[in-house]
Amino acid sequence: MQGIGSFSTFDEFLRLTYGDKHWQSSTRVVYSSSPNDYKYRNRDKKENIYDEDKNIIGSYYPTERNRSGAYKDMHVLQEIYYNTGEGDRFGLNAWYINSNRELAMLSTDYGNDMDFENRQREQTFRGVLSWDHVREKWKVGVKGGYIHTWMAYDYKR
């Protein structure tokens, strides 16, 4: 499935599933991206209008383009379950995130946006192993998880 939104925003989604008497599997992939470079009236920045004698004769709020708002995000989710048919169910859930997001400049920044980088990058893995033992009147289960996140903040002027 694909979604298209304003400011050249694109979202892609894919899901694959499989299941039989013992095995169930689901794989999902999501990718979102956007330059996110919309125009807006910057009410934090007032520009003066001068006459030839340098007297202020008016002012206005400039229309600017959002700078450093782009993003690219990818998520992959994998779920696998095995049912023994005798009351035991084993599971594996894994989720991976790869994110690259620009962080917006200050709305009063007069610098050249080509000389500026303000970005957050992230890679995260989350995994869970599980075991459930089910009987007619009771259930017991054990889950164990692991999370690893790498994150970086890049700033260059």
Briefly describe each language-model feature range.
Residues S8-S33, K45-N100, Q123-F125, L129:
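Transmembrane beta-barrel wall of Gram-negative outer-membrane proteins
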Residues M1-I4, S25, V29, V140:
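Transmembrane beta-strand segments of Gram-negative outer membrane beta-barrel proteins
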Residues I4-G5, G19, V134:
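Structured loop/turn residues at secondary-structure junctions
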Residues Y38, R67-D73, G87-E136, V140, ...:
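Flexible loop and strand-edge segments within Gram-negative outer membrane beta-barrel domains
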Residues R41-N42:
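Soluble oligomerization/assembly scaffold segments of membrane-associated complexes
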